[in-house]
Structures are given as C-alpha cells and as structure tokens.
C-alpha cells in the first residue's frame, strides 16, 4: 500500500520539525498524527482515534478545533513542548490537488507571544549562551516586548547561574559542545527547555544579521563571542517566528558589576520575588512593593528588585522622585487613575511587529495613547530631575492616535478577516462596497415582505447559511399556500421546505461578491495601517518604558506612605546605620503595631561584625534578613522601613540563612553550608554585606565551633575583606571574642524569663546572650511535660559537673584555657564541649516526631553519654 498524498505532505513537513508537535491544518481542525497524536492525547486529554493514510494500520490521530488551537498549544508549551503550526496556504475550494501547507510559526516556551497565556507582570525571556576563549557571552530577549539584553564575563559557572536566576528564562539556546557539567547544573537548578546548536550556527552571517536587525549595532562595543551569542539567539527567534521582528531593534548591553550582586542562595533566602515555602508572590518583597497600575510597571518593578543599583547618582534620582511623589498626594492619585486605563502597550507593540495584532487591540492602543497628554501634563507639575526628564522624553504619540481614531471602528470584529474593522469615511472604496452590500440586504428584506403578501404566508422567511446561500423557507403546514411554479425546491427538512428563485440567486451573487470584496479590502487596509504604525514602534516602546518607570515611582510612593517608610541617606563611607528598622514583609503579616523595631549600627572599620546570640525562635534570622532587605530597598531607590537610615552602597549581598540541603545531588546539609560559606569568603569584598546564620551547626560541636571561630577571624582580620557582617550563632563561647578581635561586638535578642517560661522581646541589645533557653523553647513547641522535667534534670546535672574554664582563668575574654608553656596557643576543654553537644542535641530533638519507646531510648542515650564524662 502507498501512503496517501496528504500524509506524504504531513511527513515531509514533520521531517523538518522533528522536535515539535505538529499541528496540521485540515479544514476546520488542526490534526496530529502518529507519536505526536499519542503525546497530545495524553497531555491534553484528547480522544485518540485513527485515520486511513495508505498504510496497513490506521495512523493514530487526534485533533482540536482551529479557532481554539491556541488554548491547546499553550498547554503543551507550558509543559515544555514545542508546537509547529502548519497552516493551509490557499483556499481549499480553489486548490488543484492537495492543499498547499507549511509551518507558519513554531511556538516554544521562550518565544510564545500570546498575551492571553503570558503572565502580565513577568517577562518571558529566552537566553543564549556562547563560551569562547574562557569568556562567557549571554543574551536575554523577550520577544513579547522587544527587549534584548547582552553581557559577557569571565567563564565562571556561578556567575552564569546567577544571571539565569535574575532573568528566569523559559528557554535556552546553547552550543553543542558546551561543558556538560554546566548544562547539568542548569538542569538541576532551573525548570527550563534548552536547544543545542553548532558553533557555526552562532557564527554564520553574524555581522550581516546583526546589522540588519539592530539599529544601534555599530554603536555597541561587541567582542566576537558576544556577536556570536546575539546572532545565535536572533536566528533562533526568526526561525521560530518565521518573520522579521522589527520591534527587537536595540541592543541593550550591560555590565554585571554595574548592579548589586545577589547570588542564587541569597536571592532565595531574602525571598525577593517569591517565597521559599510555596514559591508564591505573596509574602515576598515584591508583594509588598508592587502597587503598580500597569502590566508594564509590574514587569519593571520586578527588574528593579532583581537588579539593584550601585550608582549613588541614579539611586538618588529615584529617591528624589519618590519623595516628591510622596508629598504630592493628589497628583500621585491622579496619575494612578490615568495609568490604570493604560493597556500593555509594550506587548501591543510586539504584536504589531509580529503582525498578530487584531483590531480590538488597536482600539486598546488608541485608548492608552489617548491618556498620554494628560499624563504628560500632570508630570509637568514636578521638579525632581527624574520626573522632569520623564516629562521631556514622553512622546504623546498624537499622530498615531489620530490615525487610529480615524481608521478603526470603535467596536470592531475580533478577527481581521471578518470585516467590520475600518471606520466609515476612512476609505472610499470600502464605503461604496458597504453601500452595495446594504442595498442588497434591503432588497432581501423587501423580497421577504413581498412574498408574504403574495402567498399570504405570514411565517415565510428569507434566510442565509454558508452552505446554501440565500433561500426562502416555508413551514410544512403552509405548503398548500405556495403558488405552483413560483419557487424552485432546494431542500426538504422535517418541518419545512426551502426554495430559491433565479432573482434571489442573482442578488445573492451581488451581495456575496460585495461582502467578499469588502472583507478582503478591509483586511488589506488594516494591514496598511498596521505597517504605518510599525514604522513608529520605537516611539511607542519609548513611551511605554517611561510609563513603566513612572508607575514604579508611584508605587514606591504609595508603599512609603502606607507603611511609614523613610528616605534613606545614600553614602560611600562604609557605614550602615538604621534607626528603628523593620522587616518590610513580616510587619505586614503580623498584627498591626506588634512588630518590634530594631537599630543597626555597623561599618567596615571599627564595627565590622555584629555577633548575635539568643534562643531559637527569638528572631535572629528575621532581623538579619531585615537588614539585608533594607539595604537592597535603598539601592533600588525605594524608601525603607525605618525612622532613619544611612546606607553605604554595597556591591554584593551574601546570606547563609536556613538549611538548603541538596540531597538529590548527594550533598549533606553541612557540605552545602560549607560550600556556601566558602563561596561567600572567596567572593565578598570590603563593600559587601554578609549575613551568616548558625555557621557550623551541621557537624560536631568541636568542628562547628572551630569553623565558626575561624570564619569570624577571617572576616574581621583580613585586610582584603573586613566587610559589614551579621553573624548569628548558638556557640556562646564566641561571645568572649569581643575585645580580642577588633571590630567584633556582641549583640543578642532580649528574652524575659518568668519562672519556667520565657517571653521573646524581639529586641536587639548590645550584649551576648546569658543562656540558650532551649528547654523553654521546647516547652513552647509542645513537648510532653515529663520530657521537659527530665531534660531539666539532665541539664542541671551537666551544669553542676561543668568544669571551670574561662570564668576562672586569666583569659576570661576568650573563654579558653591557656596551655603552658606555649604562649598564645589555646586548648578547648573537650569534656565541656561534649556536654554542650549533648545539650544542643537535646534542644534539637524533635520529640513530637517520636513514639514513647523512641523517647525513652533517646533519654537513655543522653544519660549513657553523660556518665562517660
């Protein structure tokens, strides 16, 4: 048996798109065959059938209606599949033989542009990576907005991973020979689709391609590696979209060092855009700061949070604008009301460029542009430099508004191929065809009245459908009234008969001819209008960018007013002074007024490190995150949750807070912790901020204390480091280092003890903690009373057996015993540390997860170990 001609056509197209699920247009459906059908049936829950194709067995098949294909395609794309859309390229009724078909677009996670299925306030990036001569070039594009960013840096896996984390691309374009270790790291950390191409793919015709695509190509300093990287990405985009995209016309080169660096772990620990627990926006810093009114503003504020500034001049421009907006409440409110009426013109510009915009979206663009003069007039009332610059640069796009107002119907059809999109009076030929169509329909209405009078059949109707055209319909109960020979029978139905007349068919040809010509002419005129606007895409994008930044300034002002934030003073002298600082997120989720504010005073000279002790649950981690977030907020140009703040610009923020086991990679808690600490110590500079929580807790007491002690010394004593650090620990022995290590000062979370209960005061005080209060915390957690009683007995026994160490030696400040005759050498009392280890394990024991037998066994183990001391 031979394969049918249509199936041969299908297989030929599929051969060129092996990595895609092929949507093959057949009449009113898109059909999928063979393995594609099986995958689509499973993923989309479609009925799997079969189709005769000339083979011995029927080809597995499933299909979706053509008008709803985008819904099904988006579901596949969201699951990481690529979808190739093969369209009919000619009218089937006019085709000679098999209808011509070909792929008109390939839908992929990183190139999907249908705004119905994209997150409004999140960019949809696709990334390319090209490594050459130990230099990594990276490009990030969002074809829905026209954004194209590029940078390069030394070959460092962590830097690459950090950039991927900032942009969160949905798809990657990589070299075939890229190091598999890097590819594995990317796959482990990110849910992303990737494609691999030869080096030749990246390099081929790069100068010609980039010159043709980007208007500023000649002005941007690009290495050969960066050119290859950009070329590979733009080629892939054009290959999938099957058309040139004129709105992607500006290369935006940036330097990584121009922004505050926050690595992946720190970004996660600080919960900048999503929470650690459930990856939701609610509970993140973005959730607090995002009061934007437009989708463009929502995307922009996310970018600002992901890429804080280190240029004090740019930071102060934003802060001054926020301050002025904050003090002019009425103008701010008026601006917000106008911005709420602005659609996502950034993505509308992208749809114009990709020729996928419809007439209703053109009306949305017109309505948005209509608000620009009023917005421009309002901004004119401000005097801060940034807002003045915005007013001067904002193009009100008056000529584009005029064109859209004169040309597009106020309530047009959704499809641009159904007519009713061009406004009356804009095009003479369209008006004449509409008149002809209108006269024809008037004739039809007149015919219906005439035939009713002639026949006496009041229910007689002249109707239309696409199969039979116009016809006269008479119910069977009235057939006896039909004059003989007046009509030609066309169709018999259960309850009626349908007839035609030569005159009716003649008028039908005139009406349908006018309608076909009208629809085609309206479509062509719409395309001309679209092309005229496409030439002004850069102006539209420029105004969209200004509106997005203005929206962010309004949002920052709202948040500052609502939460009583202060304007930080930006400095360069290394100081960090925060008066009555608060955690921006935590204070929003607890009862109003219950958050305890705390001061922070630190620098990178004589007050380098805050050594913070105190019981678990007292608030050490919250306090440290609070400081990190306040610094970051200041550097994005936002007011901060404090009564006053002096913030010296940081180049990097590092955090080591909370467990982050990578068990799938075979790494223990302690191994991950040590890797993170190592990364921090190797990459921090004098201008960095380090937040370390419980370093050393993942190993034995001896090792943990030694490592924590050594890390403290390294940070405080290293001339190349000595940066601002908050170091929380449960090792109380370390508090004796104050006075021994220059720049280290003790702090603790205040606790009030009432009988056997404790009250967390949440207040940072300048002294070390007196004790751990582990058993009291265990009581709060709900451990059985008999376990708590026994724990107190064991603790009392341990404390009574505690050897004399630092308190009864000359070296009281370091909590160590000097060993003779070696001067300046130290020896730790290992029996004491073993007791501390038992105590720590007792505090960390999750009694609620154990049965009574396990509890008794655990207590027996503690007693056995204690007796050996």
Curated annotation (Swiss-Prot):
Family: Belongs to the DNA mismatch repair MutS family.
Entries under SMART domains matching the protein: MUTSac, MUTSd
Transmembrane segments: none
Name of the protein described by the UniProt record: DNA mismatch repair protein MutS
Pfam families hit by this protein: MutS_I, MutS_II, MutS_III, MutS_IV, MutS_V
UniProt GO BP: mismatch repair
HAMAP family for the chain: MutS
Residues given in the record as ATP binding sites: 614-621
Protein task: This protein is involved in the repair of mismatches in DNA. It is possible that it carries out the mismatch recognition step. This protein has a weak ATPase activity.
CDD domains registered for this protein in UniProt: ABC_MutS1
GO MF annotations, alphabetized: ATP binding; ATP-dependent DNA damage sensor activity; damaged DNA binding; mismatched DNA binding
Keyword ATP-binding: yes
Residue stretches in coiled coil: none
């Amino acid at each position: 048996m031979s394969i049918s001609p249509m199936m041969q056509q299908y297989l030929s197209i599929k051969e060129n798109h092996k990595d895609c699920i092929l949507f093959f247009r057949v009449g009113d459906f898109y059909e999928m065959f063979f393995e594609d059908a099986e995958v689509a049936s499973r993923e989309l829950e479609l009925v799997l059938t079969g189709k005769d194709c000339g083979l011995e067995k029927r080809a597995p098949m499933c299909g979706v209606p053509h008008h709803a294909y985008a819904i099904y395609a988006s579901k596949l794309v969201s699951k990481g599949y690529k979808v190739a859309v093969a369209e009919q390229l000619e009218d089937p009724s006019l085709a000679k033989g098999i209808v011509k078909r070909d792929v008109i677009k390939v839908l992929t996670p990183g190139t999907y542009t249908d705004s119905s299925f994209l997150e409004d306030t999140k960019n949809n990036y696709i990334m390319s990576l090209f490594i050459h001569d130990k230099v990594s070039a990276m490009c990030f594009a969002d074809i829905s907005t026209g954004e194209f960013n590029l940078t390069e840096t030394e070959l460092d896996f962590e830097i690459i991973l950090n950039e991927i984390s900032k942009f969160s691309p949905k798809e990657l374009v990589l070299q075939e020979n890229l190091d598999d270790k890097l590819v594995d790291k990317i796959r482990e950390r990110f849910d992303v689709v990737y494609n691999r191409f030869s080096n030749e793919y990246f390099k081929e015709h790069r100068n010609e391609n980039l010159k043709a695509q980007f208007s500023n190509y000649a002005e941007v300093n690009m290495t050969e590696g960066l050119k290859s990287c950009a070329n590979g990405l733009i080629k892939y985009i054009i290959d999938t979209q099957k058309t040139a995209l004129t709105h992607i016309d500006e290369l935006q080169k940036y330097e990584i060092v121009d922004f505050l660096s926050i690595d992946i772990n720190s970004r996660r620990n600080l919960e900048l855009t999503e929470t650690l627990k459930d990856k939701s926006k609610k509970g993140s810093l973005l959730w607090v700061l995002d009061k934007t009114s437009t989708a463009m503003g929502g995307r922009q504020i996310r970018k600002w949070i992901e890429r804080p500034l280190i240029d004090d001049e740019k930071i102060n421009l934003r802060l001054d604008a926020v301050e002025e907006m904050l003090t002019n409440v009425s103008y701010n409110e008026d601006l917000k009301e106008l911005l709420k009426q602005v659609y996502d013109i950034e993505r509308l510009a992208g749809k114009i460029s990709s020729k996928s915009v419809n007439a209703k979206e053109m009306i949305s663009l017109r309505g948005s542009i209509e608000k620009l003069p009023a917005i421009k007039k309002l901004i004119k009332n401000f005097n801060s430099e940034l807002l003045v610059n915005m007013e001067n640069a904002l193009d009100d796009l008056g000529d584009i508004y005029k064109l859209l107002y004169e040309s597009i119907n106020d309530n047009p059809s959704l499809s641009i191929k159904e007519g009713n999109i061009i406004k009356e009076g804009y095009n003479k030929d369209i008006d004449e065809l509409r008149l002809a169509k209108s006269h024809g329909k008037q004739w039809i209405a007149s015919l219906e009245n005439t035939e009713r009078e002639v026949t006496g059949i009041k229910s007689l109707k002249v109707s239309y459908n696409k199969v039979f055209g116009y016809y006269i319909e008479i119910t069977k109960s009235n057939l006896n009234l039909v004059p003989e020979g007046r009509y030609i029978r066309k169709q018999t139905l259960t309850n009626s008969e349908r007839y035609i007349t030569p005159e009716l068919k003649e008028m039908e040809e005139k009406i349908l001819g006018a309608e076909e010509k009208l629809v085609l002419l309206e479509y062509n005129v719409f395309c001309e209008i679209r092309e005229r606007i496409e030439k002004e895409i850069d102006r539209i994008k420029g105004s969209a960018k200004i509106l997005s930044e203005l929206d962010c300034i309004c949002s920052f002002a709202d948040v500052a007013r609502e939460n009583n934030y202060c304007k930080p003073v930006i400095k360069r002298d290394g100081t960090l002074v925060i008066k009555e600082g608060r955690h921006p997120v935590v204070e929003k989720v607890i009862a109003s007024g219950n958050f305890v504010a705390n001061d922070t005073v630190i620098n990178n000279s004589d007050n380098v490190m805050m050594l913070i002790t105190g019981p678990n649950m007292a608030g050490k981690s919250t306090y440290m995150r609070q400081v990190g977030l306040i610094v970051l907020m200041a550097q994005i140009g936002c007011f901060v949750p404090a009564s006053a703040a002096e913030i010296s610009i940081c180049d990097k923020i590092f955090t080591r807070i909370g467990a982050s086991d990578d068990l799938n990679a075979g790494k223990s808690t302690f191994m991950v912790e040590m890797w993170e600490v190592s990364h921090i110590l190797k990459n921090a500079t004098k201008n960095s901020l380090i937040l370390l929580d419980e370093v050393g807790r993942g190993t034995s007491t001896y090792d943990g204390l030694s490592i924590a002690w050594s890390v403290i010394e390294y940070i405080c004593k290293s001339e190349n480091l000595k940066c601002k650090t908050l170091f929380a620990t449960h090792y109380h022995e370390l508090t004796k280092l104050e006075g021994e290590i220059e720049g280290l000062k003790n702090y603790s979370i205040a606790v009030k003890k009432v009988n056997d209960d404790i009250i967390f005061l949440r207040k940072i005080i300048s002294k070390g903690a007196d004790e751990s209060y582990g058993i009291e915390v265990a009581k709060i957690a709900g451990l059985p009373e008999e376990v708590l009683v026994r724990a107190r007995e064991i603790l009392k026994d341990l404390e009574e057996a505690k050897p004399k160490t630092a308190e009864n030696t000359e070296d009281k400040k370091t909590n160590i015993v000097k060993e003779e005759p070696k001067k300046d050498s130290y020896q730790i009392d290992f029996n004491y540390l073993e007791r501390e280890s038992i105590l720590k394990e007792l505090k960390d024991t999750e009694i609620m997860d154990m049965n009574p037998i396990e509890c008794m066994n655990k207590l027996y183990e503690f007693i056995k170990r204690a007796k050996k001391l």
